């Protein structure tokens, strides 16, 4: 099926190529006019284009002139004039397609043209690279062209602070990796204020090596995770509290519903134990969950029944099979409460706080395009998932590479012996060689054999990748031997004799000149002369290497994907240079086992063919191609399946993030809160009045409603007015209670003041929304883990996931409404106007776990919660994403107290140092004598 679709998709190629040729011809027709311009006139075109766009012209209208402007600017600034085929590639990108351009055709330069054109709209352009080095290098090298034309260029790097990221995103053109862009999107949707957000939208993205990013890495989502709680010591404290509480006296237990409720005497005991006045004050609300979990752990979970303790670890016991569920933990802090009860180590637990797949992240962009040397084999997937067409751009010069037939050996050892022999023979002549391996282990194995043979070489793999760009750029030198995994070579050309631009840049940097910053002008002035000098040096070696046959590429194993094989071959034969490639295989290779090579091995044994004699057989080659096709189809189905499931989460994510963004941007929440009140009251009344009217339990309904707001009407009065409970009407009851709740809210606002109420609404909604969304992510993960079991009962797991996921989302939204209303009615706040300018304002976020932040300033009067002052605890966030070698990377940022001397001191207490100031104004102040420090763990 994919093959048929590929053929259908290629039918329109001719038409698109004719359109692109017309664009190149239009640019050529006006090129002389731009060549004749002075620098000032050429630079003035940017302002002219922006004015024309403001007057109603479209980007398509100005495209030929904009491309001609960039072509001439690139020639003057970096000495590179885009070829006609590069202009065609630029047109394909602007049209929202994937441009398949062979290795060495100058994709990096191609991206400059459409990025300039689209940046003129003022909405920003993102250029996505496969690693941080390329993002930095390309932003500096190609950024010189944009700077010349008056545009700003930024780059996103891992070590950058939020304020630096914000500046970079506000530039006209921003370079960065897919992981950095994706994580910034997630972090923006965890921010506590609009000022903390760094991205400004998703207008247009150009994805370099688009097949690697949108296909190879598509199955691994971006995940930000953090501890489900960060006050581990509270679990031990509340385990002690629970031991001292008496069942039916201090709390009640409903074993059937597996719930507990704390009674007034129990609350008093807890407050006395902790030394606080009111457990239900806003500052103390996180402690309530610790209390409930500790009592649940005591009464509802028992050793050797619901769990066992083994080697200092609490292991859940499956109630159906009786087996221990290693690695599984109860959520919402319950597992930690059980650990504290059993007096074993309370383990920190990470939970998903935010997640998105790369597929759904890049579908956020209004326009998406990409470049790669190998896209046609995945054209159907690009079309189905991203609605992207693939356009094969002709090469500037005819391909001269010779792709030799595969050589297949019986054993892996025999294969490597043949590879080493071939390398030794070619190396002796001086021909540069690139050897591709499928894993770090295989690259190290081959490296050891080359060392034993005395052949000098460079190794490039996941362990040794610090100098990736340098090694690849110099791999075309005479006599160079480079052993690399398939992570190598992305985005950096292997040029015969060496890379002129790389060598020129390296020399200027060695002299202390940088393409950006204070020395940018001197760097620019020195660039042309340095390039010309190095060109003459490289030219001689280039001709010498050409005479030796160009770059020789050796593949030591077929990859699962034909694209990666083609990518490896494509390192050779750039820009019409000669080159050669060959794959060495063995019947013990992983892919060979996939198509059951036993029959080949048996034939070789019967014929008594020695291990070191290769076979060249079309049937074997065909079988390998079929095996690759099967694996590619399986991987495509896997990615498609991931997307189907994530689409469920994506729809929910967009609803939550859109609501969250509106709150951050200052949306007036009054009407929404009143809708929350109406919905909450309606839900409570509906749930309590499902039976006949005479059976309604109004006492229980009123008890439940009083937990939400101070009910001002008496159900007995309503019952009397209706002439008995049997005559009461549900809709009338809802209307009466809604009116009563609105009046109570009006009184609440009058009590705290309108300004404070608006700020309280914003903070409460944000806090509750974030917490409920985190809990929902956990529940959805749990649902996803076991949903496949529905297939055994003849149910479609995806349909079941969609149905239950929707029900859970609806329940979460109801929970957000109810909890927001409850907090707004019941939080006890104290408003203070600060007298000292330097005093830090506190932010009321009773249950929200924010991204680590050192100083949150605001212009509002303080909303200060009375009661327990808790010492700050470490907050860690872990980031999980696909790395360059396909594994997950995990990073964590930890904020800790620099000095434990003041641990336990309340923020409003006098500082122990004797200054007479409050602790929060002295040693407890961020940036103060012992402030807060950040470290990466």
Curated annotation (Swiss-Prot):
EC number: 7.4.2.8
Residues the entry annotates as binding Zn(2+): 911, 913, 922-923
Positions of the UniProt region annotated as Disordered: 868-889, 915-937
Gene3D superfamilies in UniProt: Helical scaffold and wing domains of SecA, P-loop containing nucleotide triphosphate hydrolases, SecA, preprotein cross-linking domain
GO biological process: intracellular protein transmembrane transport; protein import; protein targeting; protein transport by the Sec complex
Subcellular location: Cell membrane; Cytoplasm
GO molecular function: ATP binding; metal ion binding; protein-exporting ATPase activity
Subunit structure: Monomer and homodimer. Part of the essential Sec protein translocation apparatus which comprises SecA, SecYEG and auxiliary proteins SecDF. Other proteins may also be involved.
Family, similarity comment: Belongs to the SecA family.
Biological role: Part of the Sec protein translocase complex. Interacts with the SecYEG preprotein conducting channel. Has a central role in coupling the hydrolysis of ATP to the transfer of proteins into and across the cell membrane, serving as an ATP-driven molecular motor driving the stepwise translocation of polypeptide chains across the membrane.
Protein name as catalogued: Protein translocase subunit SecA
Native source species: Nocardioides sp. (strain ATCC BAA-499 / JS614)
Lineage of producing organism: Bacteria, Bacillati, Actinomycetota, Actinomycetes, Propionibacteriales
Name of encoding gene: secA
């Amino acid at each position: 099926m994919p093959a048929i679709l590929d053929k259908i998709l290629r039918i329109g190629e001719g038409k698109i190529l004719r359109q692109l040729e017309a664009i190149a011809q239009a640019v050529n027709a006006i090129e002389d006019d731009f060549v004749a311009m002075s620098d000032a006139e050429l630079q003035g075109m940017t302002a002219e284009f922006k004015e024309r766009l403001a007057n109603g012209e479209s980007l398509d209208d100005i495209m030929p002139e904009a491309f001609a402007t960039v072509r001439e600017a690139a020639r003057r600034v970096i000495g590179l004039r885009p070829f006609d085929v590069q202009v065609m590639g630029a047109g394909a990108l602007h049209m929202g397609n994937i441009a398949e351009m062979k290795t060495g055709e100058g994709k990096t330069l191609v991206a400059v043209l459409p990025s300039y054109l689209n940046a003129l709209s003022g909405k920003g352009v993102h250029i996505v690279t496969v690693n941080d080095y390329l993002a930095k290098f390309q932003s500096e090298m190609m950024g010189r062209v944009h700077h010349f034309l008056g545009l700003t260029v930024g780059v996103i790097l891992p070590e950058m602070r939020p304020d630096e990221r914000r500046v970079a995103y506000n530039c006209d053109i921003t370079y960065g990796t897919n992981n950095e862009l994706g994580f910034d999107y997630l972090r923006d949707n965890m921010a506590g204020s609009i000022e903390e957000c760094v991205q400004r939208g998703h207008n247009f993205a150009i994805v370099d090596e688009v097949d690697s990013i949108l296909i190879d890495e598509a199955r691994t989502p971006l995940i930000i995770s953090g501890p489900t709680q960060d006050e581990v010591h509270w679990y031990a404290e509340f385990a002690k509290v629970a031991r001292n509480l008496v069942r039916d006296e201090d709390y009640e237990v409903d074993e059937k519903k597996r719930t507990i409720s704390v009674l007034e005497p129990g609350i008093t005991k807890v407050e006395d134990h902790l030394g606080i006045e009111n457990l239900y004050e806003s500052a103390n609300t996180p402690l309530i969950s610790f209390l409930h979990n500790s009592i649940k752990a005591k009464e509802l979970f028992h050793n050797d029944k619901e769990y066992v303790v083994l080697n200092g670890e609490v292991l859940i016991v499956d109630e159906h099979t009786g087996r221990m569920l290693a690695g599984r933990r109860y959520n919402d802090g319950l597992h930690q409460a059980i650990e504290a009860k059993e007096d074993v180590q309370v383990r920190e637990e990470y939970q998903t706080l935010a997640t998105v797949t790369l597929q759904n992240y890049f579908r956020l962009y209004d326009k998406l395009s990409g470049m790669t040397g190998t896209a046609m084999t995945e054209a159907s997937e690009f079309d189905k998932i991203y609605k992207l067409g693939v356009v094969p751009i002709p090469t500037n010069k005819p391909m001269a590479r010779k792709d030799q037939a595969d050589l297949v050996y019986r054993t892996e050892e025999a294969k490597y012996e043949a590879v080493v022999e071939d390398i030794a023979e070619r190396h002796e002549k001086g021909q540069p060689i690139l050897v591709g391996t499928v894993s770090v282990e295989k690259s190290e194995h081959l490296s050891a054999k080359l060392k034993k043979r005395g052949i000098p070489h460079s190794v490039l793999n996941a362990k040794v990748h610090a100098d990736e760009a340098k090694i690849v750029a110099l791999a075309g030198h005479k006599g160079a031997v480079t052993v690399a995994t398939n992570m190598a070579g992305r985005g950096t050309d292997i040029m015969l004799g060496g890379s002129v631009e790389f060598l020129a840049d390296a020399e200027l940097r060695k002299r202390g000149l940088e393409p950006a910053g204070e020395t940018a002008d001197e760097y620019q002035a020195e660039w042309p002369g340095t390039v010309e000098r190095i060109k003459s040096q490289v030219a001689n070696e280039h001709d010498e290497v050409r005479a030796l046959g160009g770059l020789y590429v050796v593949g030591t194993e077929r990859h699962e994907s034909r694209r990666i094989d083609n990518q490896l071959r494509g390192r050779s034969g750039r820009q019409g240079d000669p080159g050669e490639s060959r794959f060495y295989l063995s019947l013990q290779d992983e892919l060979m086992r996939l198509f059951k090579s036993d029959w080949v091995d048996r034939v070789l044994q019967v014929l008594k063919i020695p291990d070191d004699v290769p076979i060249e057989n079309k049937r074997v080659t065909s079988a390998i191609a079929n095996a690759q096709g099967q694996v590619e189809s399986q991987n495509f189905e896997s990615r498609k399946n991931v997307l189907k499931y994530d689409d469920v989460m994506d729809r929910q994510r967009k609803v939550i993030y859109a609501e969250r963004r509106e709150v951050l941007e200052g949306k007036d929440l009054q009407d929404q809160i009143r809708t929350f009140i109406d919905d909450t009251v309606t839900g409570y009344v509906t749930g309590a009045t499902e039976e006949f009217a005479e059976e309604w339990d109004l006492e229980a309904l009123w008890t439940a409603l009083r937990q939400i707001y101070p009910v001002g009407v008496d159900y007995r009065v309503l019952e009397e007015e209706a002439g008995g409970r049997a005559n009461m009407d549900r809709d009338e009851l809802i209307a009466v209670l809604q009116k009563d709740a609105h009046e109570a809210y009006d009184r609440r606002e009058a009590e705290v003041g309108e300004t404070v109420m608006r700020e309280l609404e914003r903070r409460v909604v944000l806090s509750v929304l974030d917490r409920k969304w985190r809990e929902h992510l956990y529940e959805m993960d749990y649902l996803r883990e076991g949903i496949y079991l529905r297939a055994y009962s003849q149910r479609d797991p995806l349909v079941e996931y969609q149905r239950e996921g929707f029900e859970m989302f609806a329940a979460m939204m109801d929970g957000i409404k109810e909890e927001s209303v409850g907090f707004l009615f019941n939080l006890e706040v104290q408003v203070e106007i600060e007298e000292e300018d330097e005093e830090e304002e506190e932010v009321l976020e009773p249950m929200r776990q924010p991204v680590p932040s050192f100083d949150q300033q605001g212009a509002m009067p303080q909303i200060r919660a009375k009661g327990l002052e808790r010492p700050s605890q470490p907050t860690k966030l872990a980031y999980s994403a696909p790395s360059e070698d396909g594994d997950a990377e995990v990073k964590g940022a930890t904020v800790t107290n620099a000095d434990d001397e003041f641990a336990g001191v309340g923020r409003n207490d006098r500082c122990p140092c004797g200054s007479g100031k409050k602790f929060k104004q002295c040693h407890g102040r961020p940036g103060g004598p012992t402030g807060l420090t950040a470290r990466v763990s």
